[in-house]
Amino acid sequence: MTTLLRMQAVAVTRSARVVLNGATLALHAGERLAVHGGIGAGKSTLLLTALGLLEYQSGSIELLGHACRTEDDFAPLRGKVGLLFQDPDDQLIGPTVLEDVEFGPLNLGWDAHRAHHAADDALDQVGLPHLAQRPVHELSGGEKRLVALAGLLVMQPTVLLLDEPTVSLDIETTDRIFQILLASKLSMLIATHDPLCLDRLATRSVRLEHGIITD
């Protein structure tokens, strides 16, 4: 079984507070692993650390088969890992929906024609082709979450890291998010405190409490 992410005894301290205290987990290909715990348990820190966006003080991280400690280690791998932020406003940067979804491919050097068609396909995938020319600031919270997800899917990632993917969503949008994620068949690490994510999305779950992961 291929291991996509392995975190071994990872410790993270932020503002003199221990957030992760020897956290250990492994995400295997084909899994949708949920990390659940209360607000402030360190779930977001776990995801950011797994992608090298926060430094860790001790332990080890292996991402997509590569040992990762420094920015130089993580940077070449980020194009294969999609991170969905808890707040889509932290993720959306384009003036229009289509331009936002095109941004990632264009940033990787795709030609404009290829990026445009890939973005169209991603918007079809999340059910929002009719919003392609809509200014991002006019979207509802649920629409922003779906556009942010389209921006990840267009990059054809190997794995998704999802930070509270259903928080503050109505049941209709939550259902749509689940349908899209399940249809993608991607491996996922999901930080959540939503029981629906555990019941309907996760294939396995662990608990994060006081910086420690338990089964």
Residue ranges and their predicted role:
Residues 36-38:
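The feature captures the beta-strand-to-loop junction immediately N-terminal to the Walker
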Residues 56-70, 77:
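Conserved ABC transporter NBD signature motif
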Residues 135-139, 143:
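Conserved ABC ATPase signature
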